[in-house]
């Protein structure tokens, strides 16, 4: 099977919530000599984008999102051990990544993928999970003041994305803004929005997120 054919099948498996098929295809891709990173960026991530776009357009609903998340999780169980083999310990530019999904949002497909990629690139991880209050994020940032800290928030819905502005405001109020870097992602997040709220960066996919994170933490 050609690589592109495998990628297309992976994309379809995510978009159609095929949990068992997604895990099997991930293993087939590894067996074919495809790197875990390519499997994620060229196979799984496009499927996540499809399901995210359909959710925004109200073409699919929460049950489908949850099943796509399970399909992604099944694939990542296969891929994570391979990613761990390439993990870079103590590389300059890394630090503590505090990852979370915005308050009011429980859609963690992209969040889990980004968290995995950051860990594979040498970051220590503090995963706060989904539906996280801004107050909780600020408290954790305060606990680690003086360390190299990257806040990584994701939002699939426009409504939950708006909370990112409130988080930035709270960080400034608590005099924490200068002690952390802030990166946000998710379907509705744009570079224009990042500039508007005064954050540091965004990324279109998990692989890019890891590269951007390493760069801004140097």
Swiss-Prot record:
The keyword Hydrolase does not apply. Belongs to the methylamine corrinoid protein family. Acts as a methyl group carrier between MtmB and MtbA. Methylcob(III)alamin binds at residue 107. It comes from Methanosarcina acetivorans (strain ATCC 35395 / DSM 2834 / JCM 12185 / C2A). Disulfide bonds: none annotated. GO terms for molecular function: cobalamin binding; cobalt ion binding; methyltransferase activity. Can form a complex with MtmB. Residues 94-218 form the B12-binding domain. One of its GO terms (biological process) is methanogenesis. Residues 1-91 form the B12-binding N-terminal domain. This is Monomethylamine corrinoid protein 1. Keywords: Cobalt, Metal-binding, Methanogenesis, Repeat. InterPro entries: Cbl-bd_cap, Cobalamin-bd, Cobalamin-bd_sf, Corrinoid_p, Met_Synthase/Corrinoid, Meth_synthase_dom. It holds the Pfam family B12-binding. It comes from the Archaea. Pathway: One-carbon metabolism; methanogenesis from methylamine. NCBIfam families: pyl_corrinoid (TIGR02370). The keyword Transcription does not apply.
């Amino acid at each position: 099977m050609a690589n592109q054919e495998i990628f297309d099948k992976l994309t379809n498996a995510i978009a159609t919530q095929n949990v068992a098929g997604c895990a099997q295809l991930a293993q087939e891709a590894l067996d074919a000599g495809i790197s875990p990173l390519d499997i994620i960026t060229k196979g799984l991530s496009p499927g996540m984008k499809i399901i995210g776009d359909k959710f925004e357009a109200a073409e699919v609903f929460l049950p489908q999102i949850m099943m796509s998340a399970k399909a992604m999780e099944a694939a990542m169980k296969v891929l994570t051990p391979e990613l761990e083999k390439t993990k870079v310990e103590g590389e300059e530019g890394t630090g503590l990544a505090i990852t979370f999904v915005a308050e009011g949002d429980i859609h963690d497909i992209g969040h889990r993928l980004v968290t995995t990629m950051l860990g594979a690139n040498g970051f220590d991880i503090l995963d706060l999970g989904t539906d996280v209050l801004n107050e909780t994020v600020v408290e954790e940032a305060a606990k680690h003041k003086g360390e190299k800290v990257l806040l990584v928030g994701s939002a699939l819905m426009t409504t939950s994305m708006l909370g990112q502005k409130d988080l930035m405001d709270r960080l400034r109020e608590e005099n924490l803004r200068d002690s952390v870097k802030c990166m946000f992602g998710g379907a509705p997040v744009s570079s224009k929005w990042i500039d508007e709220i005064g954050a540091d960066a965004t990324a279109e996919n998990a692989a890019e997120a890891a590269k951007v994170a390493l760069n801004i933490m140097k």
